[in-house]
C-alpha cells in the first residue's frame, strides 16, 4: 500500500515518513518507496506513547486480528487508524469517523485510506472521535462491565 501511495501521490514523498514498529522492521523498510524509520520492537510504555504522539496516523496492515491493542493505544493518543475490514478491526475503527477501514486484502484501498486520513479528512475531528471511542468503549470500567454481563448470561443459562 505504501508503494501505491507513493506512486499515486508523489508529493507525499517529500512530506511523509513511515515509522515501522515490530520485528523485521529493517527488512520491511528497505521495500518501501517513502522515507522509513525502522524502530524495531519496543516494549517501553513511555517510548510507545511518545511514538504514537509523534505520528499522524496508525496503519495496521494485518490480514487477521481480533481486537488489536495497538489500535486502542493509538486511538487513546488521538491517532486515527487505518486497517483492513477483518476480524475485530472494523469494530474498533469506525469508517471515516475515527479512521478508515479498507476492503480486505485491497492494498489500493489501504493506500486510499492512508491518504484520506492524512490529506482529505477533517483530521482534528478524526482525532477527537478516536479518543472518544476508546474512552467510551474500552475504558477499564466498561470492559469489566462487559465481562460481568457475559458471566451473568452464562450463569442464567445454566439455571
Question: Model-predicted segments: where are they?
Answer:
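A short, well-ordered alpha-helix in the C-terminal region of glycosyltransferases
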Residues: 122-137, 146-149
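Conserved acidic donor-binding segment of nucleotide-sugar-dependent glycosyltransferases
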Residues: 95-96, 100-107, 116-121
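Short acidic/histidine- and often glycine-rich active-site loop of Leloir-type glycosyltransferases
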Residues: 72, 86-96, 100-101
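Short alpha-helical segment that forms part of, or immediately flanks, the ligand-binding pocket
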Residues: 49, 68, 72-76, 90-91
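Short alpha-helical donor nucleotide-sugar binding micro-motif in glycosyltransferases
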Residues: 50-55
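Aromatic "clamp/platform" in nucleotide-sugar-dependent glycosyltransferases that forms part
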Residues: 63
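Nucleotide-activated donor-binding/catalytic signature segment of Leloir-type glycosyltransferases, i.e.
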Residues: 13-16, 22, 26-46
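Short hydrophobic beta-strand element within catalytic cores of glycosyltransferases
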Residues: 80-83
Amino acid at each position: 500500500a505504501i508503494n501505491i501511495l507513493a506512486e499515486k501521490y508523489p508529493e507525499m514523498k517529500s512530506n511523509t515518513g513511515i515509522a515501522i514498529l515490530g520485528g523485521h522492521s529493517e527488512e520491511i523498510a528497505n521495500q518501501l518507496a517513502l522515507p522509513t524509520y525502522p524502530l524495531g520492537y519496543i516494549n517501553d510504555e513511555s517510548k510507545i506513547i511518545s511514538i504514537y504522539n509523534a505520528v499522524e496516523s496508525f496503519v495496521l496492515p494485518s490480514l487477521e486480528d481480533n481486537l488489536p491493542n495497538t489500535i486502542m493505544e493509538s486511538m487513546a493518543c488521538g491517532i486515527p487508524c487505518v486497517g483492513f475490514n477483518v476480524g475485530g478491526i472494523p469494530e474498533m475503527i469506525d469508517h471515516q469517523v475515527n479512521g478508515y477501514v479498507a476492503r480486505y486484502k485491497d492494498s489500493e484501498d489501504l493506500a486510499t485510506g492512508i491518504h484520506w486520513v492524512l490529506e482529505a479528512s477533517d483530521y482534528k475531528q478524526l482525532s477527537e472521535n478516536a479518543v472518544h471511542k476508546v474512552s467510551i468503549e474500552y475504558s477499564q470500567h466498561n470492559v469489566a462491565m462487559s465481562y460481568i454481563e457475559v458471566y451473568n448470561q452464562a450463569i442464567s443459562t445454566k439455571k
